Amino acid sequence: MRNLFPKAFLVTWIAVGALWAGTLHAQVAGFVQVNLVSDIPGLATITDSNLVNPWGVSHSTTSPFWSSNQGTSTATLYMVTDRTTVTKVNINGNGIVNIPKTAAGPQGPTGQVNNTNTSSFPVNGGDGNSAHFIFANLNGTISAWDTGPTAFIQVTTPGAV
């Protein structure tokens, strides 16, 4: 029995060491969460009261990230310059693009796309140029933005919701 004790002790410590090394490796290979933007004060680097129930995010190769904020019927723009540095882009003086509401039903943008085709989807109500961003809304409408403080409803499907 005496001969088994040192071997069992050694095997146990090798197993503990392997477990510890595996845990250390998992921590090194893991990730760190950094909350960049939130509507909850103190939760992230930037507190933005417009970022309520965000659904969709898009961007172009030259634009900041656009967030569709269903809870405020807006889109906000954020520039991310490295892993953890974010700034809100001051578009239209207040940092938002308004997404139009309808008279009834649920409101707010849910999804969006960036339109890179400069000869397609001209904005009715805008300056006549192609839409830069197109939004799908809970109210069944499709809105488009080319410039200015507000997107414009382009298509309405009654009873879509």
Predicted regions and their residues:
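Sequence/structural signature of beta-propeller domains
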Residues: 26-161
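Bacterial N-terminal signal peptides
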Residues: 9-20
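N-terminal secretory signal peptides that target proteins for export/translocation
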Residues: 1-6
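Sec/Tat signal peptide C-region and signal peptidase I cleavage site
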Residues: 20-26
